[in-house]
Regions:
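N-terminal cap/lid segment of alpha/beta-hydrolase-fold proteins
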Residues: 1-10
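Structural signature of beta-strand start/N-cap positions in the alpha/beta core
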Residues: 9, 22, 46-48, 84-89, ...
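Conserved HGGG/HGGXW glycine-rich cap/lid loop of the alpha/beta-hydrolase fold
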Residues: 9-65
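Short, conserved loop/helix-junction motifs that constitute active-site signature segments
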Residues: 43-44, 196-198
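Conserved hydrolase catalytic core segment
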Residues: 85-125
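Conserved alpha/beta-hydrolase catalytic His-Asp/Glu region
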Residues: 123-131, 141-197
Length: 198
Protein backbone atom coordinates (compact mmCIF):
# COMPACT_ATOMS: atom_id res chain seq x y z
CA UNK A 1 0.00 0.00 0.00
CA UNK A 2 1.64 3.26 -1.09
CA UNK A 3 1.33 6.33 1.11
CA UNK A 4 2.12 10.01 0.95
CA UNK A 5 2.38 12.42 3.86
CA UNK A 6 0.65 15.77 3.76
CA UNK A 7 0.50 18.18 6.69
CA UNK A 8 1.89 15.50 9.02
CA UNK A 9 -0.83 13.03 8.01
CA UNK A 10 -0.06 9.77 6.22
CA UNK A 11 -2.54 9.10 3.43
CA UNK A 12 -2.98 5.61 1.98
CA UNK A 13 -3.91 5.17 -1.65
CA UNK A 14 -3.94 2.68 -4.50
CA UNK A 15 -2.97 3.20 -8.14
CA UNK A 16 -3.67 1.03 -11.16
CA UNK A 17 -3.91 1.32 -14.90
CA UNK A 18 -2.67 3.98 -17.28
CA UNK A 19 -4.14 6.51 -19.65
CA UNK A 20 -5.59 9.99 -19.47
CA UNK A 21 -7.54 11.51 -18.01
CA UNK A 22 -6.76 9.91 -14.68
CA UNK A 23 -9.68 9.11 -12.39
CA UNK A 24 -9.57 9.89 -8.66
CA UNK A 25 -12.18 8.06 -6.58
CA UNK A 26 -13.27 9.75 -3.34
CA UNK A 27 -15.25 7.65 -0.84
CA UNK A 28 -17.95 8.76 1.56
CA UNK A 29 -18.36 9.32 5.29
CA UNK A 30 -16.73 6.59 7.43
CA UNK A 31 -16.04 4.48 4.34
CA UNK A 32 -12.71 3.70 2.63
CA UNK A 33 -11.17 3.32 -0.81
CA UNK A 34 -12.36 -0.29 -1.17
CA UNK A 35 -15.91 0.96 -1.75
CA UNK A 36 -14.91 2.01 -5.29
CA UNK A 37 -12.99 -1.21 -6.07
CA UNK A 38 -15.33 -2.41 -8.87
CA UNK A 39 -15.29 0.98 -10.58
CA UNK A 40 -11.52 1.33 -10.18
CA UNK A 41 -11.02 -2.08 -11.77
CA UNK A 42 -13.27 -1.19 -14.70
CA UNK A 43 -11.77 2.22 -15.49
CA UNK A 44 -8.19 1.01 -14.99
CA UNK A 45 -8.52 -0.81 -18.31
CA UNK A 46 -8.08 2.52 -20.09
CA UNK A 47 -7.19 5.09 -17.46
CA UNK A 48 -4.85 5.66 -14.56
CA UNK A 49 -6.99 5.23 -11.49
CA UNK A 50 -6.24 6.46 -7.98
CA UNK A 51 -8.35 5.53 -4.96
CA UNK A 52 -7.41 7.00 -1.60
CA UNK A 53 -8.39 6.68 2.01
CA UNK A 54 -9.30 10.19 3.11
CA UNK A 55 -7.63 11.41 6.29
CA UNK A 56 -9.28 9.74 9.26
CA UNK A 57 -10.49 6.82 7.15
CA UNK A 58 -9.29 3.37 6.13
CA UNK A 59 -5.54 2.95 6.39
CA UNK A 60 -4.78 6.67 6.51
CA UNK A 61 -3.79 8.43 9.71
CA UNK A 62 -6.56 9.54 12.03
CA UNK A 63 -5.62 12.87 13.62
CA UNK A 64 -7.95 14.45 16.14
CA UNK A 65 -9.47 16.89 13.65
CA UNK A 66 -11.39 18.99 12.79
CA UNK A 67 -12.39 17.49 9.44
CA UNK A 68 -13.72 20.22 7.15
CA UNK A 69 -14.31 19.28 3.52
CA UNK A 70 -11.49 21.65 2.60
CA UNK A 71 -8.97 19.46 4.45
CA UNK A 72 -9.80 16.51 2.19
CA UNK A 73 -9.61 18.80 -0.84
CA UNK A 74 -6.12 19.99 0.13
CA UNK A 75 -4.97 16.38 0.56
CA UNK A 76 -6.37 15.31 -2.81
CA UNK A 77 -4.87 18.31 -4.62
CA UNK A 78 -1.51 17.44 -3.05
CA UNK A 79 -1.88 13.82 -4.17
CA UNK A 80 -2.77 14.87 -7.73
CA UNK A 81 0.30 17.08 -7.88
CA UNK A 82 2.63 14.54 -6.27
CA UNK A 83 1.58 11.78 -8.67
CA UNK A 84 1.61 14.18 -11.64
CA UNK A 85 -1.83 13.10 -12.71
CA UNK A 86 -2.63 16.20 -14.73
CA UNK A 87 -6.28 17.20 -14.90
CA UNK A 88 -8.35 14.40 -13.40
CA UNK A 89 -11.92 13.21 -13.35
CA UNK A 90 -12.90 13.37 -9.68
CA UNK A 91 -15.55 10.79 -8.78
CA UNK A 92 -17.04 11.15 -5.32
CA UNK A 93 -19.76 9.35 -3.39
CA UNK A 94 -21.76 10.99 -0.60
CA UNK A 95 -19.26 13.10 1.38
CA UNK A 96 -16.84 12.37 -1.45
CA UNK A 97 -19.29 13.96 -3.88
CA UNK A 98 -19.21 17.35 -2.19
CA UNK A 99 -15.45 16.95 -1.76
CA UNK A 100 -15.14 16.47 -5.54
CA UNK A 101 -17.29 19.56 -6.09
CA UNK A 102 -15.07 21.71 -3.87
CA UNK A 103 -11.95 20.21 -5.45
CA UNK A 104 -13.16 21.43 -8.83
CA UNK A 105 -13.99 24.87 -7.44
CA UNK A 106 -10.71 25.29 -5.56
CA UNK A 107 -8.42 23.66 -8.13
CA UNK A 108 -9.84 24.03 -11.65
CA UNK A 109 -6.31 23.54 -12.98
CA UNK A 110 -6.35 19.99 -11.58
CA UNK A 111 -9.88 18.88 -12.50
CA UNK A 112 -11.21 17.98 -15.96
CA UNK A 113 -14.57 16.74 -14.73
CA UNK A 114 -16.62 15.84 -11.67
CA UNK A 115 -18.95 12.91 -11.06
CA UNK A 116 -21.08 13.13 -7.91
CA UNK A 117 -22.65 9.81 -6.91
CA UNK A 118 -25.53 10.32 -4.46
CA UNK A 119 -23.73 13.30 -2.91
CA UNK A 120 -24.29 14.60 0.59
CA UNK A 121 -26.82 17.45 0.54
CA UNK A 122 -25.62 20.82 -0.72
CA UNK A 123 -28.24 22.29 1.60
CA UNK A 124 -29.61 20.44 4.63
CA UNK A 125 -33.34 20.94 5.19
CA UNK A 126 -33.88 22.07 8.80
CA UNK A 127 -35.51 18.82 9.93
CA UNK A 128 -32.70 16.73 8.44
CA UNK A 129 -30.03 18.92 10.02
CA UNK A 130 -31.75 18.60 13.39
CA UNK A 131 -31.74 14.81 13.06
CA UNK A 132 -28.10 14.65 12.00
CA UNK A 133 -27.09 17.03 14.79
CA UNK A 134 -28.73 14.61 17.24
CA UNK A 135 -26.76 11.69 15.76
CA UNK A 136 -23.50 13.63 16.12
CA UNK A 137 -24.35 14.49 19.74
CA UNK A 138 -25.08 10.82 20.45
CA UNK A 139 -21.79 9.73 18.87
CA UNK A 140 -19.87 12.24 20.97
CA UNK A 141 -21.71 11.04 24.10
CA UNK A 142 -20.65 7.45 23.42
CA UNK A 143 -24.02 6.19 22.17
CA UNK A 144 -23.40 4.53 18.79
CA UNK A 145 -26.90 3.11 18.28
CA UNK A 146 -28.30 6.19 16.46
CA UNK A 147 -25.29 6.06 14.14
CA UNK A 148 -25.89 2.38 13.43
CA UNK A 149 -29.61 2.98 12.88
CA UNK A 150 -28.92 5.90 10.51
CA UNK A 151 -26.56 3.82 8.38
CA UNK A 152 -28.72 0.69 8.31
CA UNK A 153 -32.03 2.45 7.66
CA UNK A 154 -31.14 5.43 5.48
CA UNK A 155 -28.26 4.39 3.22
CA UNK A 156 -29.76 1.30 1.61
CA UNK A 157 -32.84 0.25 -0.31
CA UNK A 158 -35.23 -2.34 1.07
CA UNK A 159 -34.08 -4.68 -1.70
CA UNK A 160 -30.36 -4.32 -0.89
CA UNK A 161 -28.41 -7.54 -0.43
CA UNK A 162 -28.44 -8.24 3.32
CA UNK A 163 -24.85 -9.53 3.23
CA UNK A 164 -23.72 -6.31 1.57
CA UNK A 165 -25.59 -4.22 4.14
CA UNK A 166 -23.88 -6.15 6.93
CA UNK A 167 -20.44 -5.74 5.34
CA UNK A 168 -20.86 -1.99 4.75
CA UNK A 169 -22.26 -1.48 8.24
CA UNK A 170 -19.25 -3.28 9.72
CA UNK A 171 -16.79 -1.00 7.89
CA UNK A 172 -18.65 2.21 8.65
CA UNK A 173 -19.16 1.37 12.32
CA UNK A 174 -15.46 0.53 12.65
CA UNK A 175 -14.52 4.16 12.02
CA UNK A 176 -13.39 5.77 15.29
CA UNK A 177 -16.08 7.79 17.02
CA UNK A 178 -14.08 11.02 16.91
CA UNK A 179 -13.80 10.64 13.12
CA UNK A 180 -17.49 9.84 12.66
CA UNK A 181 -18.51 12.92 14.63
CA UNK A 182 -15.91 15.35 13.24
CA UNK A 183 -16.41 14.26 9.63
CA UNK A 184 -20.18 14.65 9.90
CA UNK A 185 -19.69 18.13 11.36
CA UNK A 186 -17.58 18.90 8.31
CA UNK A 187 -20.42 17.80 6.04
CA UNK A 188 -22.93 19.94 7.95
CA UNK A 189 -20.65 22.99 7.73
CA UNK A 190 -20.16 22.66 3.96
CA UNK A 191 -21.52 25.70 2.10
CA UNK A 192 -22.89 23.90 -0.94
CA UNK A 193 -24.52 26.84 -2.74
CA UNK A 194 -21.41 29.00 -2.45
CA UNK A 195 -19.13 26.23 -3.72
CA UNK A 196 -21.49 25.27 -6.54
CA UNK A 197 -21.72 28.91 -7.65
CA UNK A 198 -17.97 29.01 -8.24
Amino acid sequence: MPTITHKDTKLAYGVKGSGKPAFVFIHGWTCNRSFFAPQAKHFARRHRVVSLDLRGHGESDKPKGPYPIGAYVDDIAFLIGTLRLGKVVAVGHSMGGITALQLGADHPDKVAGIVMVDPAPLVFPPELKTGVDAIVAAIEAGNQEPRRHFIANNLFMKTSDKRLVKQVLKVMMAAPTHIAAAAMKGILAFDGPAVAAR
